[in-house]
Structures are given as structure tokens and as C-alpha cells.
């Protein structure tokens, strides 16, 4: 599986840009945007929870769960027209909590899993920061296993 991407540097400049573009579309129409602005608007504004964010988070959860051999149901086919329900976002948060718990004994340097709803840039940043840190811890463990030769003498291919 390809390396998952993580976005956890959303800030209020991103929020201001989203508001600016939205107001411009409302007042002057979508066609008033430059090609660059249309691309930003069409492909997921960084400060807005959108299908690309949800798919990226779902994919990261899937990759991490596979590495840890944790069975997990994830959704990675969100579309622009789908609006996640409260139970959808709670399912995402539960998955993130499960993955965080799996490496809790290796690090305490992670934010808390936010509460539902995921409706602020801080909460979105925390979700992806947790996934990034879990993925990083797993890679450190795998690297250390290879250095000590453990991967060559194990009788199975389990990570931990």
C-alpha cells in the first residue's frame, strides 16, 4: 500500500481563504474564480472537512490497521455529495482511538482523540496528527526489529 498522507497544519488563514472563496462565489459566481482558485475549491479546501479529508483519514486507518493486523472497517469512497452523519464521524473517531490505543505503551506524545462532532480545524488536525504519530511509531518499531534481526527469526509475520 502506498504511504498514507497526513494533513495536520490547518490554521485560520485556511479558514479565511475558504470564507473568501465562498463569499466570492456567492457574490460573483463560480466562473469569477481564477483557474487556481477553482482548483482549490473543487479539490477540497484545507480548512473544510470534505470528501478528500475523509477518504485520506479512512485510507490512513486502513494502512495502519493492516500493519497492526487489527480488523477494522473503514470508508474510503466518500463523494462530494455525501455528508457524514454523527454515527459516521463517531465511527472514524472510534477507529482512531483503537489505533492510538494500540501504540499507547510506546508514546504518550499524542493529543486526545477529539469528541464528536469533528467540526473545528483543531479537531481535524488532532485526528490526523494522531494517525501520523501512530504510523511513525509503527515504522520505528519495524525499523528496530530489522536492526536487531528479529524479522528474520520470527516464526510468523506479526508486527508485535
What are these regions (language model features)?
Residues 1-160:
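Extracellular "spike/adhesin" assembly and maturation modules
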Amino acid at each position: 500500500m502506498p504511504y498514507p498522507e497526513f494533513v495536520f497544519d490547518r490554521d485560520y488563514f485556511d479558514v479565511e481563504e475558504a470564507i473568501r472563496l465562498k463569499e466570492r462565489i456567492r457574490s460573483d459566481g463560480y466562473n469569477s474564480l481564477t483557474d487556481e482558485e477553482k482548483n482549490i475549491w473543487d479539490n477540497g479546501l484545507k480548512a473544510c472537512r470534505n470528501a478528500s479529508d475523509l477518504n485520506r483519514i479512512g485510507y490512513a486507518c486502513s494502512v495502519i490497521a493492516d500493519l497492526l493486523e487489527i480488523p477494522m472497517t473503514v470508508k474510503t469512497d466518500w463523494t462530494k455529495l455525501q455528508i457524514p452523519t454523527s454515527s459516521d464521524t463517531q465511527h472514524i473517531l472510534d477507529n482512531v482511538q483503537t489505533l492510538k490505543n494500540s501504540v499507547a505503551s510506546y508514546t504518550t506524545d499524542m493529543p486526545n482523540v477529539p469528541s464528536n462532532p469533528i467540526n473545528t480545524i483543531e479537531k481535524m488536525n488532532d485526528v490526523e496528527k494522531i494517525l501520523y504519530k501512530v504510523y511513525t511509531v509503527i515504522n520505528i518499531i519495524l525499523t528496530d526489529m530489522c536492526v536487531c534481526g528479529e524479522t528474520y527469526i520470527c516464526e510468523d509475520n506479526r508486527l508485535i
